[in-house]
Amino acid sequence: MSMQDPIADMLTRIRNGQAANKTAVSMPSSKLKVAIANLLKEEGFIEDYKVEGDTKPTLELVLKYFQGKPVVETIQRISRPGLRIYKKKDALPKVMAGMGIAVISTSKGVMTDRAARQAGLGGEIICYVA
């Protein structure tokens, strides 16, 4: 059986891994997943990530904790295969009044809501992370 929403699966693996106090989670890799992992690392939500394997690449995320608690409080899928959510640059959301990030897929690549506002770009809202 094929996976219907690989991004939702990635976010669920992160959520479940942190709930179980895992040090790392692994999943099948894709360019979009690597771009999201790179953003999460830049914003300080995960320690690190790496892609292993040539024929079937696997993405491994090293989860981050602060004083024994997960750094990621909430991670929520917004745009999904059955209902895509697009916003113009003026309508981009602020997650937790700027404390979290919205991951946006734009014509210039995957970026945070802050970077998209600065670049004057709108796009598909992939997920919220706080």
UniProtKB/Swiss-Prot annotation:
What is this protein called in UniProt? Small ribosomal subunit protein uS8
Lineage of producing organism: Bacteria, Pseudomonadati, Pseudomonadota, Gammaproteobacteria, Enterobacterales
**One GO biological process term:** translation
Recorded source organism is Sodalis glossinidius (strain morsitans)
Q: Which PROSITE patterns match?
A: RIBOSOMAL_S8
Q: Which family does it belong to?
A: Belongs to the universal ribosomal protein uS8 family.
Q: Name one Pfam family in it.
A: Ribosomal_S8
Show the Gene3D superfamilies listed in the entry.
3.30.1370.30, 3.30.1490.10
Keyword set, alphabetical order: Ribonucleoprotein, Ribosomal protein, RNA-binding, rRNA-binding
- Molecular function terms in GO for this entry? rRNA binding; structural constituent of ribosome
Provide GO CC annotations from the record: ribonucleoprotein complex; ribosome
Keyword field contains Ribonucleoprotein: yes
Assembly and binders: Part of the 30S ribosomal subunit. Contacts proteins S5 and S12.
